[in-house]
A protein has these predicted regions:
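Metal-ion/cofactor- or nucleotide/acyl-coenzyme-handling active-site neighborhoods
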Residues: 1-177
Length: 177
């Protein structure tokens, strides 16, 4: 049997209970900060809390400025919450790599897939098989009539056509222009 690592909203997929991932990664700030996705995020946490009947490690960012309480959102004893660092170090290369190898820093990852690869390497995995990974980070980028950078974000679990939405810098929303 192979260990499986899942990300984002996979728990809402009907195959979640069959796949039974040993590891789960949430790295997008929408999972620990207030966002327009709050209802869907709440549904994800409810689903994880109710459906995980096996031991699973949930990897979340150590950075958590609003002090989101993962344990309160996930009162499931089968889920072990593990924090990973996202602090970017710029300096001596030897120190940088030492921090990376010990999980005390990261390389400013742009996608949850990169975070998964990093976590898997920290766990000691030498071979990784990636399934369903979409490497189209730049696809769907556009500029709207108000000169805001927008993205039509597509995922396998979304049936509706992707509509370009402004990409915001921070909470509160301030669009890239």
């Amino acid at each position: 049997a192979k260990d499986v690592m899942a990300v984002n909203y996979f728990a809402l997929d009907e195959r979640f209970g069959t796949v039974r991932p040993a590891y789960y990664v949430l790295s997008d700030p929408m999972f620990f900060r207030d966002s327009v996705c709050r209802d869907r995020v709440a549904e994800l946490y409810r689903t994880l809390a109710e459906k995980v009947t096996w031991p699973m490690n949930l990897y979340v960012q150590y950075y958590n400025p609003e002090r989101f309480d993962y344990r309160a959102a996930l009162p499931n004893p089968n889920i072990r919450i593990v924090r990973f660092h996202t602090q970017v170090y710029r300096g001596f290369r030897g120190v940088e790599f030492w921090l990376y190898r010990h999980g005390l820093g990261s390389a400013n990852f742009g996608t949850v897939v990169q975070v998964c690869e990093y976590v898997a390497l920290l766990l000691g995995y030498k071979t990784l098989e990636l399934y369903g990974v979409d490497h189209t980070l730049l696809d769907g980028l556009s500029v709207d009539d108000e000169n805001r950078l927008c993205r039509a974000d597509r995922h396998y679990y979304d049936d509706a056509p992707a509509v370009p939405k402004p990409i915001f810098q921070k909470v509160p929303h301030r669009p890239y222009t």
